[in-house]
Amino acid sequence: MNIEMAYLLGMILGNGEIQQNSTETKITIDIPHKNLYTDDMKDTSVYVKASLFDIQSILEPLIGQHLIQSETKHSTKITFSKPNNEYVMREILRLVGSGTHHSTMKMNEELFSITSDEKKALLRGIADVTGYIRASNIAFKKESKQHRVYIEIPGNWYMVIDIANMLKAVDIPVQTIDFGHPNFRDSNVDKYNEGKKYYWKKEHQVKIYANEFLPIGFNIKHKQEALEKYSEELIKKNPNMKTHKFYWEKPIRRKTKPNHPCENDEALPEEIRGKHFESWPDLAGLLGYGE
């Protein structure tokens, strides 16, 4: 393992796909343009294109070939192929739990034993393809400038916990996890009663205060610029705010919610199926993110 390999693994775990035939393995990584324009109205795709030079310099020496790039309005894809029997391909498959799509991948336990710098590189790879920084005034109702990094994970419950635990391993607390679960995404059963029974089946969002995410950072230029700007603003506007707290170090807020008819849905992991949750830490703890 090295920092370059860790970064590549993070990109694959975050938004990668692996296709394999009898002789060759093809890996595609999708870098979405979450918003078409940055906060200062610059074209996101231009920033991603500029950042690809840095990403190429990290990955191409590792894989020993040029990355193939393609672009649509909403994302940039990078692709490479190598023979199945090459060591780097066998290692990638092993370390992503043999999943072929990011929605089915899981971090191999070995990844939690790599160096701190390698863990940060892995998280940076994940953040570059799934994360974005958001200027937010909803973390606290009475205060603004509570800016956070959002890492979005569609469908993969166990990857949410893997990412939270990897952040914990480098001493970065999660501020909140917005699970794609009926008790959180349709907490008052309003959408269900409107006939939108599966409205709650949304991506999971891991949220981290911007200043706490600085040790990870982004290789995508516009994301890094926003991270630095919003981190400075958060600290300046809230000098006494204690962002460095894990959920088990502060009181857990539970909100009484009605039972939701979809709490037994087959799409939910077996460990939480049939259970009712009134706080995200209760769910996260049951799946393995805790003290």
Task: Describe the predicted segments one by one.
Residues M1-E291:
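Internal intein/HINT superfamily modules and their associated LAGLIDADG
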